[in-house]
């Protein structure tokens, strides 16, 4: 299957012009209506900074392959005039529903495909894809951290397992749900020493916040969570 390079190249053209990349990509992301979703979640602003701008900036950081620290320190591409703490505070907000945000992106993307005549034909074969991958980390005090088996390296590494659920519409693979998992191991200690477990980060959570559910899922099996994902988004099969 050949990708439509002429359309993908539009993004690369934006990336090649540093002085206008930020404005052009913010306009492109504006089609996804992130501000309306954040408004419904009561997350419009924090410390006087637009939540939608922070989230879109985080997306741009991934596109250019730079860290928050480096972007803010060197003002690369003039993507943001905010300090790095604004981004860190956004990422750890207990009320932030990252799953809902990701699903919003996916559904809005499908709507845009239909709007511009790029939606797959009705007889196209579609499917769900559920797969896991390793997110290797170095911080042993991170909450929920454990030693997980990396099939690529053939050994256990410190980190998390990322479970990702995506929808393949015959042309595009669209991720729309995810969860992070730890592995208890044979000894039930996550592969950590007693001292490391004691020093790991812990916090009390409000059971009504999305971060509470994320942490509960971290301790569940991937199969259980995958079944929950299928139950939540099974209606997408008919789209």
Model-inferred region functions:
Residues 1-239:
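Conserved, well-structured functional cores that handle cations and Mg-NTP chemistry
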């Amino acid at each position: 299957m050949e990708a439509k390079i002429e359309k993908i190249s539009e993004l690369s053209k934006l990336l090649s012009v540093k002085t206008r990349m930020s404005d052009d990509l913010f306009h492109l992301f504006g089609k996804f209506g992130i501000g309306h979703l954040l408004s419904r979640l009561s997350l419009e602003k924090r410390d006087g900074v637009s939540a939608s701008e922070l989230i879109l900036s985080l997306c741009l950081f991934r596109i250019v392959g730079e860290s928050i620290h480096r972007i803010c320190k060197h003002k690369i591409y003039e993507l943001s005039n905010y300090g790095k703490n604004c981004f860190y505070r956004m990422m750890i907000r207990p009320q932030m529903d990252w799953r809902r945000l990701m699903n919003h992106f996916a559904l809005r993307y499908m709507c845009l495909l239909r709007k511009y005549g790029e939606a797959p034909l009705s007889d196209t074969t579609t499917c769900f894809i559920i797969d896991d991958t390793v997110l290797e980390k170095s911080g042993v005090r991170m909450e929920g951290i454990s030693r997980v088996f990396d099939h690529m390296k053939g050994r256990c590494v410190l980190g998390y397992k990322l479970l990702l659920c995506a929808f393949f519409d015959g042309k595009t693979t669209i991720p729309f749900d995810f969860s992070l998992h730890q592995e208890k191991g044979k000894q039930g200690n996550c592969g950590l020493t007693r001292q490391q477990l004691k020093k790991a980060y812990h916090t009390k959570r409000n059971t009504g916040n999305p971060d509470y559910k994320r942490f509960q899922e971290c301790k569940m099996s991937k199969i259980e969570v995958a079944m929950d994902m299928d139950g939540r988004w099974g209606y997408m099969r008919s789209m």
